[in-house]
Amino acid sequence: MFPPLWKFTLLCLFLLACTSAEVLERSSKPQTPDKDPFYDPPSGWEEKEHGTILRSRKVDIAFFQIAKVKYKEAYEILYRTSRSEEDQPSTTVTTVIVPENAKKDKLVNMNVYVDSNGARCAPSYVLQRNAKLATDPALSYQQVLFSTILDEGYILTVPDYQGPKRAFAAGRLEGHMAIDGILATLNLKELCLSKDTKVIGYGYSGGSIATGWAASLQPSYAPNLNMVGWTFGGTPANLTSTLEHLNGGTPAGFAVSGVAGIVDEYESVADWINDKLTHKGKHALDFVREHCTVGIVLRYPFTNILSDSFMKHGAQLLQSPIMKKVLGTLNMGVRPDETPKAPVYMFHAKLDEVIPYGSAHDAAKRWGDHGADILFEEFTGLVMGHASTELLNLPNVLLFMRDRMSGKPFIHGYEHKHTDNPLEDPGVIAKGFDALAETIKNAIDNTVGMGDKHMKAKIEQSRRRRIVS
């Protein structure tokens, strides 16, 4: 059974809505990663093994940067990691949250969706108490998920998986940084975790890029990790099809952020594109590098990144040899030697308006063909929007985590399941998730709305205001 979280959740959601553009004046405010010396690695860091701790500190965590969260202790770890290639050293930070009832042999790698490029969007900053109140619900919306997993007694490690350049959508980089965040957490002496600690990786939407690639790369990059499962949904498994799907639509701002992330990670793309961007295109990339999700999505609805107003000969953006070469390496499930070894539970709404369903399904099927044990659940209900699906499916995610942590058997091979609404699934209802289901429904109704109707309306209102002004 679960504690009655809904009152606290609704209060926080209300405060978030009422103070979205305000700064809470408090003492001892943390600094953003681009200004905080904690993020600057010590000399000689490049020679360290990936996953090596370079620096750590205790921090005070608060969801929504307002309310004190029930937890025993929290740490930030600066660690050595890799960019897209293993021989490209880098560093980043993960935030470790230890619940009061911590199970010292169970760890969850939680890759929250950042979906943006600004320094102040990094989880390690936004999660800290007294940080500026984020205008984005990316972390705040996942309040129920954080609380529920912590209530299970699982230690959380939440990496800044986009790295110091905040390279959103650079999947291989994100996968390496997520894996090394796990290694660094296991190496933190204060936690006294065993190397045999059972680990599960989770991510949704932009966070599923990190999780999906971590699942793919872990068997070769960190084979000694005791991964017992991966679960992710709303997955941009094929970056080319995702950018094409987003382009010109309501959530086109994500496409702008994705292009900026690829440009900032791949020098070959930067060299090719920088003299081709128009003033509008350059301004757009500069804007997303300084802002977070909501600001970006509200600023760039219906933007066409394949137009000549964005880039000279804009239609060539995704078809140029340089771009095709890079994007071709960012499709999940293509290489048989990049197949998850631990059980995978993957889920996606059939009517997802942000991330194309077909690409995610194709990746899951290919992984199955390559030998992965994978359950792919397709949600067909009209209320299953991109944003709302994550919370609506929380009971299934939690059941998967419980079963993997307890060593229960999983399916062999590939299995495809069809469900209308997970909260109405008899199997979920039978598990006694009544209180959690009520929390989820209230949280969705007060944020994005069922089928994401509130979120879509807000974007449309912003677009109309921009036209008028």
UniProtKB/Swiss-Prot annotation:
Keywords: Disulfide bond, Glycoprotein, Hydrolase, Lipid degradation, Lipid metabolism, Secreted, Signal, Virulence
S-S bonds: C121-C292
Domain of life: Eukaryota
Positions glycosylated per UniProt: N238
UniProt xrefs under PROSITE patterns: PROKAR_LIPOPROTEIN
Places the protein is found: Secreted
Signal peptide coordinates: 1-21
Enzyme class: hydrolase
Originating organism: Malassezia restricta
UniProt name for this protein: Secreted triacylglycerol lipase LIP3
